[in-house]
Amino acid sequence: MIHTNLKRKFSCFVLVFLLFAIICVWKKGSDYEALTLQAKVFQMPKSQEKVAVGPAPQAVFSNSKQDPKEGVQILSYPRVTAKVKPQPSLQVWDKDSTYSKLNPRLLKIWRNYLNMNKYKVSYKGPGPGVKFSVEALRCHLRDHVNVSMIEATDFPFNTTEWEGYLPKENFRTKAGPWHKCAVVSSAGSLKNSQLGREIDNHDAVLRFNGAPTDNFQQDVGTKTTIRLVNSQLVTTEKRFLKDSLYTEGILILWDPSVYHADIPQWYQKPDYNFFETYKSYRRLHPSQPFYILKPQMPWELWDIIQEISPDLIQPNPPSSGMLGIIIMMTLCDQVDIYEFLPSKRKTDVCYYHQKFFDSACTMGAYHPLLFEKNMVKHLNEGTDEDIYLFGKATLSGFRNNRC
């Protein structure tokens, strides 16, 4: 019996102790909630935290004072200095690149071309390694590179043999002037770029050789205003005469001459004898604008590339890509160039529409491509971020130059 009473007393004691503990915990929780609520009242809102680390009206950071209109006290907070995380440098084209960047195979090719000198180059101008500011180089290009087309008054195109074949309308009345233009390379790094819509938003778009838009619209767009083709394609591509790819926009054909040859000299010895194919095309498509670039222009451009380059460059004409860039700088206020300077998608795949691998497509073998890219990087007025993410370089055209 005594044992049972002790058991009951002990149970009551435990219950009282638990009840007391619960009351204490509840009271402490209430006090904590009150303190938390009070802290929330004076906590800085996130929107004001953002203001505190950037520019803000001066009143926010001055001592507390009364708003004379509202009679409400304005709380002030101390300025918070944001710690800026250092940005890693973006790996983009170095405008001071030299042949030391080439692999042994491309170095050997470069030396072979120097020895061959197929086009009898004998450069006697200034340089190498002449330095120009961006604006001075633009002026130099504008004044010394004449972008013009063969006309029916040029001998021997003024003979009966050529009567009716060349376009009657002057190139400059047919093309431009435009405000914002795009030059779209054929580089493999354009694949999966998703740049199509951006490219098509330009006033005019220049493409090269047989680079298609069908099946690649998302990456390269659909618009073609000018297509620059080389004489090798015109003479060897069987589909050239009938493929609809070559009936959209304005066609410009170029063929390299011997160094600084005039039109009659070049006509006697073209690099590729495209003349009969050109006539056949004009008979099939008489309304299609199809111009022939004067052969002096590529060598005028080559002279300037050699002048500013620290090394001897290949004695071969500039690439179609570089010629197209200069053509559009003549016609447009602003030229956006896509994947001439490689982006983060850089690849040894030469073309976005073919599976052909060769590092020469980026670094150059036949053409002085490495130094062409140096020139474009020097002229670039866009950001390294644009180059890295989109492969986009932005150049000003010649029309707005203050020379």
Curated annotation (Swiss-Prot):
Entry annotated with the keyword Glycosyltransferase: yes
InterPro entries the record matches: Glyco_trans_29 (IPR001675), GT29-like_sf (IPR038578), Sialyl_trans (IPR012163)
Modified residues (Phosphotyrosine): 366
Cysteine disulfide partners in this protein: 139-403, 181-332, 350-361
Any one cellular-component term (Gene Ontology): extracellular region
Intervals, Lumenal compartment: 27-403
Reaction it catalyzes: a beta-D-galactoside + CMP-N-acetyl-beta-neuraminate = an N-acetyl-alpha-neuraminyl-(2->6)-beta-D-galactosyl derivative + CMP + H(+)
Enzyme class: transferase
PTM comment: N-glycosylated.
Pathway it works in: Protein modification; protein glycosylation
A GO molecular-function annotation: sialyltransferase activity
GO biological process: N-acetylneuraminate metabolic process; protein glycosylation; protein N-linked glycosylation via asparagine; sialylation
Record annotation: effect of changing residue 139 to A/S: No effect on enzyme activity
Residues passing through the membrane, by range: 10-26
Glycosylation sites: 146, 158
Complex and partners: Monomer and homodimer.
Role noted for this protein: Transfers sialic acid from CMP-sialic acid to galactose-containing acceptor substrates.
Protein name, UniProt field: Beta-galactoside alpha-2,6-sialyltransferase 1
Lineage: Eukaryota, Metazoa, Chordata, Craniata, Vertebrata
